[in-house]
Swiss-Prot record:
Ranges of residues in domain EamA: 70-139, 160-286
GO cellular component: membrane
Note: Lipopolysaccharide (LPS) is a glycolipid that is a necessary component and antigenic determinant of the outer membrane and has been shown to be an important factor in the host-parasite interaction in a number of Gram-negative species. H.influenzae is able to display an extensive repertoire of different surface configurations through variability of its LPS oligosaccharide.
Coiled coil: none
UniProt protein name: Protein LicB
């Protein structure tokens, strides 16, 4: 039961973080530097909190494992996360969130071939329904905005980065706990962000995020950190397929919370696709091909 709760919370927190980020005033020139600065703060703060937690639990023995989860952090963080937030900048959260939720398709295929995870036909149907509904939702929501090629490229990079991260992290969790893997993942992503920030500073990119509203910045950082922490716990407790099935509902939460917080209208077709996506998730959750 805890695994399902962590999965749902990861989606809710991710939606809130994306919505707050969507409201930040970013110009095209300042976007990259400020996005990387923001992501660095999210992961650095998370690294400190998780590190202290593991130290207090005397769980700092990583059994010689470092490079695999660190690599997953680079793929999911500096590469995947940067691309995701930049896609929000170019396409808005209402288009980027649903379409980016296609990453489980690639992760599921990788899990099947690399991790040898079994997927029953019922689960395949539910998972396919969730993914197809999410894709149609992205198309429907995106009809009212101008499609941006750069934003689409960032989305592809995001999907590839996230799917690779989830498979590598899941493999590492065969020998370490979810929090331990998350800590090592944060080590990799933090180092990656620092390297990118150093390069951007040499190119005179703006790295100043203090011009933003402090409440918004705090919200993006806190909700983003909580989302990732819950996500990794869900992966550890439920395995990748179920954790991803819950996590991809962030597109639904983003649309629903966008309506409640920012009065973003929801059309009937959007509601229908949302229900279909939820149905696909429910079917996936109850398959018996993977034991908890």
């Amino acid at each position: 039961m805890r695994g399902y709760l962590f999965g749902i919370l990861s989606a809710v927190f991710w939606a809130l973080s994306g919505l707050l980020y969507n409201e930040l005033p970013l110009s095209e020139y300042t976007a990259l530097g400020k996005v990387i600065s923001l992501l660095f703060l999210i992961d650095f703060c998370s690294l400190l909190v998780i590190g202290i937690t593991l130290w207090r639990k005397s769980a700092v023995d990583f059994q010689g494992v470092f490079w695999q989860p660190a690599l997953s952090g680079i793929l999911g963080g500096p590469i995947g996360m940067s691309a995701y937030l930049l896609s929000i900048h170019y396409l808005t959260i209402y288009y980027a969130a649903p379409l980016s939720s296609l990453f489980p398709v690639f992760a599921a295929l990788m899990s099947y071939w690399i991790l040898k995870e079994k997927i029953t036909k019922t689960a395949q149907f539910g998972f396919a329904l969730a993914i197809i509904s999410s894709s149609l939702l992205a198309i429907e929501v995106g009809q009212e905005i101008t499609f941006n090629t750069i934003g689409f490229i960032f989305l592809i990079i995001c999907i590839l980065g996230w799917s690779s991260e989830i498979v590598i992290s899941s493999y590492t969790m065969r020998s370490l706990s979810g929090l331990q893997v998350y800590f090592l993942r944060l080590c990799g992503s933090t180092i990656g962000y620092l390297l990118i920030l150093f390069i951007l500073s040499l190119k005179n990119f703006s790295l100043d995020i203090l011009s933003f509203n402090y409440v918004q910045i705090a919200g993006v950082i806190i909700f983003g950190a909580l989302s990732y922490c819950c996500y990794y716990q869900a992966i550890y407790l439920l395995k990748p397929i179920k954790a991803m099935a819950l996590n991809i509902t962030y597109s639904v939460w983003a649309i629903g919370l966008g309506y409640l917080l920012y009065k973003q209208p929801i059309k009937p077709i959007t509601l229908l696709l949302t229900l279909l996506l939820s149905a696909g998730v429910i079917v996936t959750l109850y398959y018996k091909g993977e034991q908890k």
